[in-house]
UniProtKB/Swiss-Prot annotation:
It comes from the Eukaryota. It is found in: Nucleus. This is Heat shock 70 kDa protein cognate 4. The keyword ATP-binding applies. It comes from Manduca sexta.
Length: 652
């Protein structure tokens, strides 16, 4: 097996996408359903676990055990206000495990809980397998993207999810940075360009300003709203139709989760239609209490329902310009990323804000991030082709980092939007005479007082020799590596005593053992899924064997070649088996195989007799009889896996 290339994965809130750089260009890889993006959904049922399209398609039937939006939980605490607010909207249950959120579902008849990292790792596994099916090789290395807004613990947790899925995460990069790389390849080498990236996806909204010069990217600023995206637009439409339903039928369909889910699916479809048409119709049979709901919505009404949300996308644009100290006239290019940027009204607002400037839509907005991640993966994995040779990438810290000094003041060492990797050192001293130690508390945030910022971690430096206040010199160093992981160290200059901490968010972070355990569990789930697949194959093989046998027996041409008693024996046995199959849908693989052997034991001698008599029927038997050595003459061998012809599974 040749070394597989590294892949780029856009792990989205609602959809994910995977790309690979090979033969000098990026390929975005379609999944087994032929879709180039895969829903970030995982579902658990009585019999199996579904990931991606299969999970999203059955969400209406199984809302409580279908997990989505894991990205909203990853790297956060249960008490987090945003987590508490989000929980009100989710049909699945979120519980606290030592302050960390876990998602509770029923799987194969028992209650299971999963960390967000585990759920995300399942989606990543799906993306990994999608790439493997396309490349025909085992994929090990990946670059995974996160929103520019993600703090340290969210980045670290995303990296852990990669590890659990069996990937070696080469780097975590910001989504807008990835989009910029995708873009930089097309636009290389024309002086300095300022690019504004407007990324409105299914769940998050990010605006970033980058400067590109001679293949070097520098991120100047980032802003956004972690809670604005396509789903919010869907919600507005859902509420609109719920009200309409109340007016028309005096009934509240929100009491029925499944009805609500079906309505939401229809709304999402209508929204997509409205990006290219000015009207969309919705037809849902027997939506609620037997009522068929047929209605329509115009583009104008959709825009009116979301007017405030669409308008609010301009605020982060203004903020990012302020942060980058630029005027809007200095932006050379505007790049659209994320499926929701296809909405004409959003494009119009943005274009008007930039005084009619053309928007760049050349890159498919759903795929731009994965595209850039794939290029970055190729660079980090040592792709030597000239297409990627000249790219350098400078990422930034999304929030300011510093320590608490006397009076609870936030003293910043690394300002937000500083290009990383970076290292900053500052000297501090003691606050009182003969102070034996100092407590170094590390915070991230933009507020003046640490109580309003986010504590990342703390450590003590002890053993400071007695001295008057203000005399000892304590040198504090902040060092951020290319993945945005922070190391903080403090050294007392006279004794050279040192202590340090790596901020990988101690509390929010999974321990080595937990990751280890999850890696093993992921393996176990994968094996169970595999077993489930094999069982279904065995069942399908048995079923098709029965039906093939029956149709062979009923073939006119064979009338005089086979005795009625033999024919009856086979037909009876086949009918018995089909009956057994109907009442044993959940048998295991061995039982199906045993039944097939039993059936073959009866059929094969009769069939052999038939063939010796017939001297090999022209055209052979339908599909080549599975289980019959080599298939019947003229049939070209048995179908692989004992199944006759293609078997189709998973119906939406």
């Amino acid at each position: 097996m040749a070394k597989a290339p590294a892949v780029g994965i856009d792990l989205g809130t609602t959809y994910s996408c995977v790309g690979v750089f090979q033969h000098g260009k990026v390929e975005i890889i379609a999944n087994d359903q032929g879709n180039r993006t895969t829903p970030s959904y995982v579902a658990f049922t009585d019999t199996d676990r579904l990931i991606g399209d299969a999970a999203k398609n059955q969400v209406a039937m199984n809302p409580n055990n279908t997990i989505f939006d894991a990205k909203r939980l990853i790297g956060r605490k249960f008490e987090d206000a945003t987590v508490q607010a989000d929980m009100k909207h989710w049909p699945f249950e979120v519980v606290s495990d030592g302050g960390k959120p876990k998602i509770k579902v029923a799987y194969k008849g028992e209650d299971k809980t999963f960390f967000p990292e585990e759920v995300s790792s399942m989606v990543l596994t799906k993306m990994k397998e999608t790439a493997e099916a396309y490349l025909g090789k085992t994929v090990q290395n990946a670059v995974i993207t996160v929103p520019a807004y993600f703090n340290d613990s969210q980045r670290q947790a995303t990296k852990d999810a990669g590890t659990i899925s069996g990937l070696n995460v080469l780097r975590i990069i910001n989504e807008p940075t990835a989009a910029a790389i995708a873009y930089g390849l097309d636009k290389k080498g024309s002086g300095e360009r300022n690019v504004l990236i407007f990324d409105l996806g299914g769940g998050t909204f990010d605006v970033s300003i980058l400067t590109i010069e001679d293949g070097i990217f520098e991120v100047k600023s980032t802003a956004g709203d972690t809670h604005l995206g396509g789903e919010d637009f869907d919600n507005r439409m859902v509420n609109h139709f719920v009200q309409e339903f109340k007016r028309k039928y005096k009934k509240d369909l929100t009491t029925n989760k499944r009805a609500l889910r079906r309505l939401r699916t229809a709304c999402e479809r209508a929204k997509r239609t409205l990006s290219s048409s000015t009207q969309a119709s919705i037809e849902i049979d027997s939506l609620f209490e037997g009522i068929d709901f047929y209605t329509s919505i115009t583009r104008a009404r959709f825009e009116e329902l979301n007017a405030d949300l669409f308008r609010s996308t301009m605020e982060p644009v203004e903020k990012s310009l302020r942060d980058a100290k630029m005027d809007k006239s200095q932006i050379h290019d505007i790049v659209l990323v994320g499926g929701s940027t296809r909405i004409p009204k959003v494009q119009k607002l943005l274009q008007d804000f930039f005084n009619g400037k053309e928007l760049n839509k050349s890159i498919n907005p759903d795929e731009a991030v994965a595209y850039g991640a794939a290029v970055q993966a190729a660079i980090l994995h040592g792709d030597k082709s000239e297409e990627v040779q000249d790219l350098l990438l400078l990422d930034v810290t999304p929030l300011s980092l510093g320590i608490e000094t006397a009076g609870g003041v936030m003293t910043t060492l690394i300002k937000r939007n500083t290009t990383i990797p970076t290292k900053q050192t500052q000297t501090f001293t003691t606050y009182s005479d003969n102070q034996p130690g100092v407590l170094i508390q590390v915070f991230e945030g933009e507020r003046a007082m640490t109580k309003d910022n986010n504590l990342l971690g703390k450590f003590e430096l002890t053993g400071i020799p007695p001295a008057p206040r203000g005399v000892p010199q304590i040198e504090v160093t902040f060092d951020i590596d290319a993945n945005g992981i922070l190391n903080v160290s403090a050294v007392e200059k006279s004794t050279n005593k040192e202590n340090k901490i790596t901020i990988t968010n101690d509390k929010g972070r999974l321990s080595k053992e937990e990751i280890e355990r999850m890696v093993n569990e992921a393996e176990k789930y994968r094996n169970e899924d595999e077993k489930q697949k094999e069982t279904i194959q065995a069942k399908n093989a048995l079923e098709s064997y029965c039906f093939n046998m029956k149709s062979t027996m009923e073939d006119e041409k064979l009338k005089d070649k086979i005795s009625d008693s033999d024919k009856q024996t086979i037909l009876d046995k086949c009918n018995d088996t089909i009956k057994w199959l109907d009442s044993n849908q959940l048998a295991d693989k061995e039982e199906y195989e045993h039944k097939q052997k039993e059936l073959e034991g009866i059929c094969n001698p009769i069939i052999t007799k038939l063939y010796q008599g017939a001297g090999g029927m022209p055209g052979g038997m339908p599909g080549g009889m599975p289980g019959f050595p080599g298939g019947a003459p003229g049939a070209g061998g048995a179908a692989p896996g004992g199944g006759a012809g293609p078997t189709i599974e998973e119906v939406d």
